[in-house]
Amino acid sequence: MSDSKYISIKGAKVNNLKNISVDIPRGKLVVVTGLSGSGKSSLAFDTLYAEGQRRYVESLSSYARQFLGRMSKPECDFIKGIPPAIAIEQKVSSRNPRSTVGTSTEIYEYLRLLFARIGKTYSPVSGQLVKKHSAEDIVQCMLEFPQGTRFTVLAPLFPREGRSLMEQLDIDMKQGFARVEVNREIMRIEDYLMQLQAEGEPKKANVYLLIDRMTADHDQASISRLTDSAETAMYEGDGACMLRFYSADGSTQLFSFSTKFEADGITFEEPTDQMFSFNSPIGACPTCEGFGKIIGIDEQLVIPNRALSVYEGAVVCWRGEKMSEWLKEFLHEAPAHNFPIFTPYYELTQEQKDYLWHGPREKACIDSFFKMLEENQYKIQYRVMLARYRGKTTCPTCHGTRLKKEAGYVKVGGRSISELVDLPIHDLQVFFQNLQLDDHDAAVAKRILTEINNRIQFLQDVGLGYLTLNRLSNSLSGGESQRINLATSLGSSLVGSLYILDEPSIGLHSRDTDRLIKVLRQLQQLGNTVVVVEHDEEIIRAADYIIDIGPNAGRLGGEIVYQGDMKDLQPGSNSHTVRYLLGEEIIVPPLAHRPWNNYIEVKGARENNLKGINVRFPLNVMTVVTGVSGSGKSTLVRDVFYKALKREYSESSERPGEHLSLEGDIRMVKDIEFVDQNPIGKSSRSNPVTYVKAYDEIRKLYAEQPLAKQLGYTAGYFSFNTEGGRCEECKGEGTVTVEMQFMADLVLECESCHGKRFKADTLEVKFQGQSIYDILEMTVNQAIEFFTEHKQSKIVKRLRPLQEVGLGYVKLGQSSSTLSGGENQRVKLAYFLSQEKTDPTIFVFDEPTTGLHFHDIKKLLEAFDSLISRGHTIVIIEHNLDVVKCADHVIDLGPEGGERGGNLVAAGTPEEVAQCEVSYTGQFLKEKLK
């Protein structure tokens, strides 16, 4: 195969890859698929990306390299034809509190440029356009009057350099000026000087120097004369010039012009792009320094339940015997100010909220209450109370816009930059489509608008039209931040690169998958090679080339079981992917759904975009919450349902999302657990066997061996986390890290224990011929076989759940940091399965199918059934239709994302939801249930 058409990998041995060789076609859309743990990421990220990135970094100088991540060479014979690689992962990339969707997609940078170039400044006093005038504007003013209209050209008289008015007039007269206008009356300068000598200088007088007297005419001579006079007037009047027109009926009209950027007596800043940057001291609000929030009294802590009225005790700090005096006083004063004391807080107008918070001076209001607390801070109870209500609160100066107030005076199309970043992206697109500009502005903004419109379209294409540009990057989900990175990559339109994406379909509803495929195609059509690690059937079918790694996971994977396109699929393959794609293996929905009578109901949920909905979560069944991206699934399940119940069952300090009440059979459940995909442990010492508490039993077993007893070794002696039996050279890690300045850190096997983590005498203690190190090297499947054979039922019982959730291929001592997100979540699931929890518990999962192959999903559903059979309840946020069709109860939110979402569209069995015409989930379920 010719080098230019393929990226050739020969003998890849990273992690569990078994010396594989593969040719990836360049300039195509390639999907790498396979079971969870089969080696997809090892091939795509640890081999392809690592090498593409390393070669690019190697081409830089050693000075530049020290600022970049140092990269080691992947274990591989050779890789040919690899372009520079860019990885777009699921990680929420930005922890920076200043980073927003607008800044990370670069749309905000272009908006700043747009406002700096064509923004119009309006005076906050009169609303008039602030403009710098030139002589042309003055000529234009004359041309609008009928020919023959008399007018004068005037300049305001400013005594300069500390002179008196009389001295200034004297100098002007010597320079050849003859007349002034005083209080609309024209006088000769010498007459006015005599008047001043007689009466003394007035404190304030409107005195203008008369520069010229003319009649309006459109001929060239008049225009030239007026231009000269106007320039003289502006020079004499310190940038200001007036024209006074006299009409036939004796009335006059005065027009003011200025070369300064001012109006209504205020001098404005001329727009620059720095003026709109909240990361620059020039543009950032001085109070919050561009964060938009300050530490102050947090509205959400003072009024946690916005569904209550003031009368019902919405203001928490006014509860209790002593503080309720404030409430009584407020209720007494309220009728006089037309304040509705029985209206729920969320229904109050802004004016009414302002009265409650800021009130009239010296009256009972929330501000004056906290002022009293601050004045009495020397008493500890007041200090404690103040601390309880302090939190991040919107900056009172900029109201969360992050910019100085001057930036708000500049508008494009009648809107300020702060108003634009608050619009959802689909509304922003409509704004720019309808933006009317004059010829000059349109020419200036043409290129900028192209860039903005393209990037907005890319965000729409990846299904993120519901986000706003000022949404903080660190508040996005993994799938959202990955798709933002994808849109940014499209925006930067690089060519000839290798893009490697990790499951871009995460968090995407089936409705948006087509659009995602289109985006991936666009990226490929620019001339890039796009490699996607993916399990989504539609994306696999849309690929130009499929690489399937397997046949199973871990040690039983790491081989290429299929490579080619969709047309060449052969029945009877040993590839699970091929068998699912050909319909030889399927996930069969249950014959009947479990009936239910008991439930917990969330009433009036209105956190974020939820529209005050009532939702029932049935108990002891599997409920799946669906809906398009941004429809409010995570808000409902995690922020409202989970946090509110957690508060019921334990002293949880986290504030639940806004809702009226929780009703139903709350007491039938004893606890609620949220199982996410975060790593089970960040350290290299944490591993699955310690997480499911099986290692404790294994250590006890070794401590009971005759040699251990003889030498006095306790169970703690067999731990690699505490001093004793572990190798002290590497502190039980098995490896030693040597720091190198310009190259990747070298991780070397420990010379003392040769990677075995324990001292030699510890390893002499054996059980059935196996040392503790040998046990840690076994996979879960091997260990279960070994311990079953030797009648160690306690250990087997702890390990069995790992096998049940499909992690039989993982080594007992494998570091958690090498596990994928899907694997982490399943280790947690195994932990819950291993606990003999008899108390009924609700388990909440957020997209548990992330990183899971069709075959793994089957096992996951079996694990869920096992939990339900023990009396537990499962609630899942999920898009995967194979999981949705197996649910007992489906809750569909929508119909769209963002502001157009947050409603309960349908609820019932999958078959009932499939009948719902307005539900997108229903439309796709219908196909799946056929």
Give the role of each language-model region:
Residues 1-930:
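Conserved phosphate-binding elements of NTP-dependent enzyme cores
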